[in-house]
Amino acid sequence: MGYSFDRASKDVVKKLQGRDLRPVECLSDATKFRLFHILQETPRSGWETEDIPVGFTLLDLLEPNFPVPEPEVSAPKPFIHVQSTDLEANLNVADIARGGVGYVGYGGYNIEVQSTSIPNPKLEILQNRKLLDKLPTFMKFCRMERKNLYVVTEAYEVSKDTMLTGLSSVNLLVKGFFKQLFKVRGKAGRSEKYSIPIPKGSVLAYKKQQLVIENNTCVILPSATKKKMTFPDRPLKLYDLPVTLRYQEEVIETGSWIDDIDPIGTIEEPANLNFMCLQHEVSEQTQLLAELSKDVQEVVFSSFLHMLSDRDVLYDLMKMLELNQLGHMDGPGGKILDELRKDSSTPHDVLKDLNLYLLQALLVLSDTQLCLLAQSVKMGLLPHQVELVKSILQTNFKYSSNTPFTLQPQLLAPLQGEGLAITYELLEECGLKMELNNPRSTWDLEAKMPLSALYGSLSFLQQLQKANSSSKPSLSPGYI
């Protein structure tokens, strides 16, 4: 597996074991999470929240000529990690051919990071400071949209230039029909080498504290817990909640989950409540997607296919939509923005929210998974993958401990050869231990969020592909 920037950031966060420490997921924004930078929190539906840097610091918003606290800087800490994956199997492929399938990957890093922080006592200098009379336009938008804002108070920066390296390869030993399909003798497949430079000063992880703005003054709360809204004069209403939370409120209010409670000791909460919410949300959003015109769905489908291999482009598009900035953007992302600017029968907010939903789900996934999704679309694997991931979540969502489970044979049957190798690697990247010769695995609580995002991504892409089934997707080599 290639070691991408977001994977390295998440790994460093685990090793630091800091409370409320969050990873930076996109290298292009790694300098926008430094001390005092302001972040807009955005829910990622059923999986998590995303912090979007707005391009301003707290110091840009406060009246000038005030003292600025001196940050505390730690000594550099080294982090070294090497990881490899090797999956091999001999499988029957629908009585057509016999061959070997394998996935081989390795990746790693050697990074030094140091923290810069402003402890709460030093933040007292900035408490209750007056804001500028004329604030940036994003502040008005955040107030109208009831968005919460945060300030970075601790950042872990790379102390010297470094490099992430790795390789991922899917190989298929082909015979019979597959020999003609791939037009080769022996092995067929794909491999990709990774080499990503990480410049000095890039932020891998950060801590944030919430801002409360009232009476033209700014208060920094002691933590990021949302005890108050950033703009208290704009109270949060039920219809402002994400779909998952609204549905959960309805389920709890009606008590429809009561009969589904399992015996004490197997779960931490009403059985399947969260999965019911997730399933309802994905179904509701997918239905809205299906109601778009075929032309609009074709634009969205082709645009996302060409963006799947480029996390930075996906992230930039998400930022523009989150901050309601519909300006110029090159490439396939620009086509989606063009659709949003059109005066069409599709409501602007509906189309924007649906694109955001898919973007937020995709950005939970690793770079390897994004490339594998593009290949899954091309091979027509999505319907089978949706059902497989759904069955894993439905069975294990309620468990907080490591629990063995077995993949259902009827769901694995359509996934043979390279399709099975791709699907297993998608699951492996979520945190499940998979072996191609073995349908058994063990549930890991940390896999819940990426699996949920994978379920949402697969469901959306399946609907888009279904709407575009009359024309086969054409992916240029640069996008796979």
From Swiss-Prot:
Which GO CC terms are listed, alphabetically? cytosol; plasma membrane
Superkingdom of the organism of origin: Eukaryota
InterPro entries, alphabetically? Gasdermin (IPR007677), Gasdermin_pore (IPR040460), Gasdermin_PUB (IPR041263)
Q: Hey, what's the signal peptide range on this chain? A: none
Q: Where is this region: Triggers pyroptosis?
A: 1-226
**Record note on domains:** Intramolecular interactions between N- and C-terminal domains are important for autoinhibition in the absence of activation signal. The intrinsic pyroptosis-inducing activity is carried by the N-terminal domain.
Q: What is this protein called?
A: Gasdermin-C4
Which organism was this protein described from?
Answer: Mus musculus
The top of its lineage is: Eukaryota, Metazoa, Chordata, Craniata, Vertebrata
